Amino acid sequence: MKNILIGIVAGEASGDFLGAELIKSLNIIHSNIKFVGIAGPLMLKEKNVESWFSIEELSIMGIFEIINRIPKILNIRNKIFNRLSFLKPDLFIGIDSPEFNIHLEFKLKKNGIKIIHYVSPSIWAWRKSRIFKIKESVDKVLALLPFEKKIYDDFNIPCKFVGHPLADKIPLYPDKYSIRSNLEIDKNSVCLALLPGSRLTEINLLSKKFLYAAKIIKKNIFNLKILVPMVNSLLKKRFEEIKREVAPDLPITIFDNFSYEVMACSDFSIVTSGTATLECMLSKCPMVVGYCMKKINFFLLKKIIKINYISLPNLIAGKKIVPEKIQNECNPEVLAKEILIIFNDKKKYKKTKKIFYKLHKKIRCNSSYNAACSASCLINKLTIK
């Protein structure tokens, strides 16, 4: 039996999770498979995975941060292209990170390699013209969100809505008090989760605001317990440095990972935009979304972004169900005020959790298996369905 080689590139923590679940499913379908490229720590725990570069090399945000790293990023991309062109994998899967992956996919496809792009770029939000480059670069797009497929259908680009792996992994009814017991958290405490980001630039920009907000909330809720999950030791160290500077006396429990558990056992959260907002929704944890960036980045992006919402719960619902506080509105007083509104309005609190449940069911589709089946169709040179 011929061994199967798959090139794969994930660029940040959310892509690492998606990649790990996909690899797990593909390893079940194919016993003779190997993955090479850029993999994160979760992907590397799965069988037959080899990473040529650290995932941290691609985990950056902000226009000027990217500009400063362009030479190194281009060098990595060229090296990956050269290696994969030599190895001729049966399939290449680019997971998210479109600015890195789409160009790589375009060049690999020209070399006769089959291409899947896993996670639709946010063409519905900005730079919709990218869809023409995507059409030239991929054999199939795997979309995580239900409204994305129609966009590709309109341009005759093969696309499958596979659902979201987080929706499959997280139970519809999280056992809040069992999780609290496992984390040694008092079941009678009021818990606030702080999630200032999974990238260093986010930690630097948002941690102070979130911590100051937590100090205000603590003054209003006497039995408040503040929980903070951190995805790696680098971010944890930086967050602790900021805490010592702005809130040395604020009692906080920091967890290594355990992001789902922290959200599921919390009563509410302050969370940055991105996958964490989806995870909060799936954990049935009412939230306030806070996000800011450097002023010049915000000024430039404001000119080109064409959406009404930045958080995934609001985008999936097609309406505002969680408050979003962006840039100047993302300040401690406003964030704290929104959390206290959630805390005091029990009727709205319950309604929000019911909406979260309905949205959870909508995107719970056994997604990793669906994605693996789509990949297998290309591996086996079957007709794309």
UniProtKB/Swiss-Prot annotation:
Pfam family, one: LpxB
Keyword Membrane: no
UniProt KW keywords: Glycosyltransferase, Lipid A biosynthesis, Lipid biosynthesis, Lipid metabolism, Transferase
Protein name per Swiss-Prot or TrEMBL: Lipid-A-disaccharide synthase
Disulfide bonds: none
Family indicated by similarity: Belongs to the LpxB family.
GO biological process, one term: lipid A biosynthetic process
Keyword Glycosyltransferase: yes
Gene Ontology cellular-component terms listed: membrane
